[in-house]
UniProtKB/Swiss-Prot annotation:
Gene Ontology biological-process annotations: protein refolding
Any Pfam family matching the protein: Cpn60_TCP1
GO MF annotation list: ATP binding; ATP-dependent protein folding chaperone; isomerase activity; unfolded protein binding
Gene transcribed to yield this protein: groEL
Residues holding ATP: 29-32, 50, 86-90, 418, 499
HAMAP family, sorted: CH60
Annotated catalysed reactions: ATP + H2O + a folded polypeptide = ADP + phosphate + an unfolded polypeptide
Cellular location(s): Cytoplasm
Stated family: Belongs to the chaperonin (HSP60) family.
Organism in which the protein naturally occurs: Wolbachia sp. subsp. Drosophila simulans (strain wRi)
Stated name of the protein: Chaperonin GroEL
Task of the protein: Together with its co-chaperonin GroES, plays an essential role in assisting protein folding. The GroEL-GroES system forms a nano-cage that allows encapsulation of the non-native substrate proteins and provides a physical environment optimized to promote and accelerate protein folding.
Enzyme Commission number(s) from the entry: 5.6.1.7
Amino acid sequence: MTNVVVSGEQLQEAFREVAAIVDSTVAITAGPRGKTVGINKPYGAPEITKDGYKVMKGIKPEKPLNAAIASIFAQSCSQCNDKVGDGTTTCSILTSNMIMEASKSIAAGNDRVGIKNGIQKAKDVILKEIASMSRTISLEKIDEVAQVAIISANGDKDIGNSIADSVKKVGKEGVITVEESKGSKELEVELTTGMQFDRGYLSPYFITNNEKMIVELDNPYLLITEKKLNIIQPLLPVLEAIVKSGKPLVIIAEDIEGEALSTLVINKLRGGLKVAAVKAPGFGDRRKEMLEDIATLTGAKYVIKDELGIKMEDLTLDDLGTAKNVKITKDNTTVVSENSDSDSVKARIEQIKSQIETSTSDYDKEKLRERLAKLSGGVAVLKVGGATEVEVKERRDRVEDALHATRAAIEEGIVPGGGVALLYASSVLDKLKGASDEEQIGINIIKKVLSAPIRRLVKNAGLESAVIIDYLIKQNDKELIYNVEAMNYANAFTAGVIDPAKVVRIAFETAVSVASVLITTESMIVDVPSKENASSPMGAGEMSGMGGF
């Protein structure tokens, strides 16, 4: 491989090409009347999806320069997906339109730094306006919760109602997970007991699902300790017993490092041991209490610590905890238990309640209530089924999107949906003036781009957007939307066409961040096949003039 430097108008043209591909491929999935996209796989049948994030990841242009730019777009979707798990299609629409508009201005000779400064200035004003438009959502208003989920699930009422019902059952601190069902029933909810804490896997090598970048272990044993583990020798007897049992192992410890961590990773990669390790949640005395909670929930005999005088070498499988399944992301661990009705769990709950009553510290009471909610709130498992694997995967994508959107709505409230929140927010830019002509161009770009999501939603429904947008603006009612599913104008909250404010905010913030980076990029260094590689689709003649880009 060799590389070349691409800059100037050739780079700007590549930016516009990729932005146009994204706008025409990812954007067609937007809204209830959006279309599905087929993504070819190296093996098996193509995946049919309406998930904008998956479509964006599937775009791999043949030209090396375009492929590099597409990967940056995909990274923006990934950031949005990681933060809220939804809004990736909106983020793609905003990013691609910002790039196309800014690239035209740069090609006309305008200063790119000034344009970026104007975009950043407009961003700050728009974020404040989105926050002011937000309306708090209550768990008691189950219809509002359901509507958020229904919209994110592309109008599927069964998904929306199931998620709303799950939220109501487990509460704000409860956990909701999604898994594929072996049956043909489209969607069912199973309520069980478990908890989630904010610690992720200690090494990405523990990952079992590379597509979602998570660890999923069924029926694992749990070894819970307050100790730091840095040598493997004391663990060998229990690890050998685990291997013989054929079950996975999850280790929760103060820390795992050095030889202990590397040995676990090597054995996992070789297939000899299904294992994952996470750090214990919390700090100090609170960490000790949370480990005791986990031990009680999983039926472990004890948390292994120096005070007990128990040696690691003497552990047996009977001393360990068990769970129905454990899911670990880079940030969180979810334990679904089969030990929920045990006397020890009930006694632990009563003990925490008693501590809440006797505590004189508001801070301590708050933390105790969090522990109580985690221990007693439960876990709702949404089981997704279908007639074929393709159907199951497509439905699971929509369920997960809807679940993420619902969580975001509970956190930061809701705003009118259907793309109007950004459209109406753009009106505050009328009074914003840039310090230079280029800054004003940047502000004007944001003002124009903020109408892109609603334009795309209406276009996907086969309608003319200009007439609808003009009518909405003239009515001067920030709760008025155009419902592309019912094909009529309506109040957003009455019609249930609403979006989580957090999803709208993150999608816009991320789009501005990525667009700002690309706008100020003057050159890109791109790897291309060497001239000697005759089999390359890009011959030597193309390389010398860089026509293969």
